[in-house]
Amino acid sequence: MTEKGLKGVANPSAIFLSTHGDPVAGSCVLVTLEGTRPLLVEIQALVDSGGPSPRRLSVGIERDRLAMMLAVLHRHAGIAAFDQDVFVNAVGGVRISEPAADLAVMLAIQSSLRGKPLPRGFIAFGEVGLAGEVRPAPRGQERLREAAKLGFSIAVVPKANAPKKAVEGLTIHAVERIEEAIALVRSL
C-alpha cells in the first residue's frame, strides 16, 4: 500500500524465503500452490535431543501429518527421530495444507538430524505415502518453471512430475520412494 493506492508485489515468494548467506541445516524450499499460483516457501526443521517425552511441534504444517511423516521416515528410510524433539516451521506463517509438502518437510528433518545443509538452490515437492512411495503433485510443470524462474537449480520431484523436456537452468532428479530421495540428497 502506498499513498497512491495498492501496489503489486513483484515476487511474493520472497516473503516466504529466508535470506541466509549460506545454506543451513534443516532448511528446504518447497514449491506449493496458493490457489492456482506456484509459491516458493521455506520449510525449516529443528531436531534436538528430547527428554522423557519428545515433543512434535509444527507451525504451518498439520501436526498429525508431521507425526505420520516421522513414522514413514523411520520405517522406510531408517531415520529414527522417535526419541528427539522435532520442530517444523513454514516461514512467513503460511499454512500449507496440500500433501505435496511432505517430501520437503522430510528432507528438512533429515538435514537437521544430520546437521548437513541441502545444496544451495535446492527445491523439493511431492506427497509421501505410508508405504514410502513419492506421489505426484498437481501442476508439477508450473512448479518447476516457477523455481527455475526464481534461480533455483536443483529439484527433487516425484517421477510422475518429471518433465519430458528439460527445464532451462534446473537439474531435476525424479524419485519414486522416500529412501531414494534421502540417498540422493546425501550424495549431493
Question: Where do the protein language model's features map onto the residues?
Answer:
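Peripheral, non-AAA+ core regions of ATP-driven protein-machinery
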Residues: 1-188
